Design a protein with these regions (language model features):
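A shared catalytic/ligand-binding motif for oxyanion handling
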Residues: 1-166
Length: 166
């Protein structure tokens, strides 16, 4: 991208997209916000249902879905930017997707993670270790990490493990 330009990104946990009205409202909201990239977590679509997620002006929609209606992540890239896809990496459980490509000859990588509720710190650590060779200064990592980083972020009095503390 040229100097002085930016990439606008929205990231949302949508808590399921199986209801048509919810998909329609989400599509309208994305169009109104008008970002270049939109990352969705917890889409909960089965692989055979992913064609149901459509947004006018967004042909590049990439999913990672489990076999059941659990987890699921998506990266949507607006038609307004000339994003050339080079590589897509997904996990089979639908917890992360990585899209590598370029915008105006400049490499970009977007990683969208939805960590499982149980074992989230270990999952995040392992995922980042697995993709370490793909991460560089042009990598954007977003997600729902299901991990409180400070006691203030926790709703219960449960002790926070040292590995997740900031």
């Amino acid at each position: 991208m040229a100097i002085g330009t930016y990439t606008s990104i929205i990231t949302l946990n949508v808590n399921g997209l199986n209801v048509p009205t919810k998909r329609h409202r989400l599509a309208e909201w994305i169009q109104k916000q008008d970002p270049y990239i939109c990352c969705l977590k917890e889409i909960r679509l089965r692989p055979k249902d992913t064609q149901r997620l459509k947004v006018r002006g967004w042909k590049n929609i990439f999913h990672a879905n489990g076999k059941q209606r659990k987890a699921g992540v998506a990266i949507l890239i607006s038609d307004k930017i000339d994003f050339k896809i080079k590589k897509i990496t997904r996990d089979k459980e639908g917890h992360y997707i990585m899209v590598k490509g370029s915008i105006q000859e400049e490499d970009r990588t977007v990683v969208n993670i939805y960590a499982p509720n149980i074992g989230a710190p270990q999952y995040i650590r392992q995922t980042l270790t697995d993709i370490k060779g793909e991460i560089d200064s042009n990598t954007i990592i977003v997600g729902d990490f299901n991990t409180p980083f400070t006691p203030m972020d926790r709703s219960s009095k449960q002790k926070i493990k040292k590995e997740t503390q900031v």
